[in-house]
Amino acid sequence: RYLAEKICNSLGCPLGQMNIQHFADGEFAVSYEESIRGRDVFLVQSTFPNSDNLMELLLMIDAAKRASAHSVIAVIPYFGWARQDRKDKPRVSIGAKLIADMLSTAGIDRLITMDLHADQIQGFFNVPVDHLYASSIFLDYIKTSLPLDNLCIATPDVCLLYTSDAAD
């Protein structure tokens, strides 16, 4: 909710109201507290730290489609399961493709996300994907505010080398 509020404040638009009802067995249901008929609905939801966030997003998408939203745009700052982007050994799932299929089946019209583990994940979707990079936000600050002669940028794996290369 915090990020959604910051985005709305920055854009000067109101944050829509939702209700999430929790049940004793751990299930939950979502509903919109206002009409979204004919509206473009942006759903801001990370898939981290657990799968409940993903399920909540899927239910929000479904509810928006059933409420006759004009379009449903999923804004996922952290796309979980993205490291599962290929079959690197026998008998493994491709989690990123499965999540893409689930989001598409639920009814998203577009995805906005940041710093995917691998660019190929964009191809898993049958809707437009806006893949944003945090490095574009931070590079100017790093270049102008930090002593570059002693700066080292590290990455947790090879797939993220493009980020550290961008600082050169």
Predicted feature descriptions by range:
Residues 1-2, 6-158:
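Active-site loop-to-helix "anion-binding N-cap" substructures in soluble metabolic enzymes
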Residues 162-168:
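Conserved small/polar residues in nucleotide/adenosyl-binding loops
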